[in-house]
From Swiss-Prot:
Lineage: Bacteria, Pseudomonadati, Pseudomonadota, Gammaproteobacteria, Alteromonadales
The reaction(s) this protein catalyses: (4aS,6R)-4a-hydroxy-L-erythro-5,6,7,8-tetrahydrobiopterin = (6R)-L-erythro-6,7-dihydrobiopterin + H2O
One Pfam family linked to the record: Pterin_4a
KW Lyase (keyword) present: yes
Keywords from the named record: Lyase
Name of the featured protein: Putative pterin-4-alpha-carbinolamine dehydratase
GO molecular function: 4-alpha-hydroxytetrahydrobiopterin dehydratase activity
Stated family: Belongs to the pterin-4-alpha-carbinolamine dehydratase family.
Principal EC category: lyase
């Protein structure tokens, strides 16, 4: 399979299929630092990134904002001193789509 970070997001409509359990098991192995959370019945990907100070955390947040705009897929972002929590899910389908895994991999690359 092509590296997730090399893929582009596709338009996700309300009738797009959520990832299957089998797809979830395969895709989550490709982004090992991410976890799956369920909030209000909605499955989401989440990772906490740690930084030495607030300025570095904010710089990462701004890079992530640019990436999200470029891909037209937007995460939940919680920025605080030394830490940024990023949550990906597809709002239109209220769950996980392959786009979320692509964006998680691209988010990881922002640290490179």
């Amino acid at each position: 399979m092509t590296a997730l970070s090399n893929m582009k997001c596709e338009a996700c409509q309300a009738d797009a299929p959520k990832v299957t359990d089998e797809e979830l098991a395969e895709l989550i192995r490709m982004i090992p630092d991410w976890g799956v959370q369920v909030r209000d019945g909605v499955m989401q990907l989440e990772r906490v990134y740690k930084f030495k100070n607030f300025k570095l955390a904010m710089a990462f947040t701004n890079k992530l904002a640019d990436l999200a705009e470029d891909e037209f897929h937007h995460p939940g972002i919680f920025t605080e001193w030394g830490k940024v929590t990023v949550t990906w899910w597809s709002h239109s389908i209220k769950g996980l789509h392959k786009n979320d895994f692509i964006m998680a991999a691209k988010t990881d690359q922002l640290l490179a």
